[in-house]
Amino acid sequence: MPSVIGTNESNIDFRNQVDFVLGDSHGRSCSPALTMMVEEIVSDMGYSVVRNSPYSGGFITRNYGKPADGIHALQIEIKRGLYMNEHNYTRNSGMSEIMQDMTYLTKHLVSLEPHALAA
């Protein structure tokens, strides 16, 4: 996501403040426990995290996430300025750290037992 994303309906200024936005269609596309787990892991890595604002999840998240059926869809938006120069679209020095952190998150998620994802 762009580093500057304006303000939301709550008049919270997101410019340069939010590193990650987790979109779970307000709890409808992903188990709240799974969203909370991702939020805690990302936050523990030192990033700022918000849920569903300004991005609550797009078409795929809304249409394919069915937590009651064991299908969880969580949109993860990452502030571009953390890993790239937004003017010329080249990697910056933060790319390696983001890659390591997302690898850690992914390994944690794929190691979960299905019952841990119950909606």
Where are these regions (language model features)?
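His/Asp/Glu-rich mid-to-C-terminal helical/loop segments that flank catalytic regions of hydrolases
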Residues: E86-A119
